[in-house]
């Protein structure tokens, strides 16, 4: 079992002061799988559209794998049990598959953090998801390390999805230990915020590596730099690269 450190993506309010609220009614949420009876584990409500978004991202990514941030709110019911409402998701624009792990690149981390802070007002980072085809859902040692170092708040969770089998598995914090959760609640809500990798690029939160490294762009940039005409601002550089790419 993994120890839980402080998380750099945690809400500064902290889980101990999570607002109190009623959980979604039975008419709006359906249990998928078997819920863990332990009151110390968070209960997870995920919007149906979020799950469909993740499943679509995983299918598009194929063997490369997919990942991203889960966005929403951390709450407590009137009896004190923690629960999370996940009604937002950001697809990572770039991942690396390393053995049995899915890794976010440093550029992807930066883009995800920027999107979470600028485009998801009223929501916080509830955790992350990643998808690997053809393997039973599990957390690799590297992914456990990611959960420890980046998603260590008491209410932050991890979702692993296998698009081949359709299996989902969730992990969350029980005190200082990272444990597998039981089922989750599929939640019907119209208010979702979903951000695909292409939207990160459109909003200039992420620039594909090939745009900066393709030979034509490199040569044009080098020539402009020597003439002293290559722009210094990031926005102007992006525009210049696009012009040279045609």
Task: Describe the predicted segments one by one.
Residues 2-125, 134-231, 236:
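Conserved beta-strand-loop surface patch within small alpha/beta domains used
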Residues 234-246:
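Membrane-anchoring helices that localize proteins to membranes
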């Amino acid at each position: 079992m993994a120890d839980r450190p402080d998380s750099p993506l945690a809400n500064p309010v902290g889980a101990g002061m999570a607002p109190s609220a009623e959980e979604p009614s039975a008419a709006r949420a359906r249990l998928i799988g078997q819920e863990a009876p332990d009151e110390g584990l968070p209960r997870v409500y995920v919007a149906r559209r979020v799950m469909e978004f993740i499943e679509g991202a995983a299918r598009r990514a194929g063997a490369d794998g997919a990942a991203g941030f889960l966005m929403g709110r951390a709450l407590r019911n009137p009896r004190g049990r923690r629960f999370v409402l996940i009604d937002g998701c950001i697809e990572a624009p770039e991942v690396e598959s390393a053995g049995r792990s899915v890794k976010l690149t440093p550029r992807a981390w930066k883009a995800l953090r920027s999107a979470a802070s600028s485009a998801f007002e009223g929501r916080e980072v509830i955790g992350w998801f990643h998808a690997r085809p053809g393997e039973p859902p599990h957390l690799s040692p590297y992914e456990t390390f990611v959960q420890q170092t980046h998603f260590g708040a008491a209410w932050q969770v991890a979702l692993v999805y296998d698009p081949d089998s359709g299996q989902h598995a969730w992990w969350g914090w029980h005190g200082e230990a990272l444990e597998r959760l039981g089922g989750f609640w599929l939640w019907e809500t119209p208010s979702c915020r979903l951000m695909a990798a292409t939207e990160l690029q459109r909003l200039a939160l992420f620039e594909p590596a090939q745009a900066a490294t393709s030979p034509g762009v490199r040569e044009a940039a080098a020539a402009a730099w020597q003439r002293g005409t290559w722009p210094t601002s990031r926005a102007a550089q992006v525009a210049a690269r696009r012009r040279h790419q045609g």
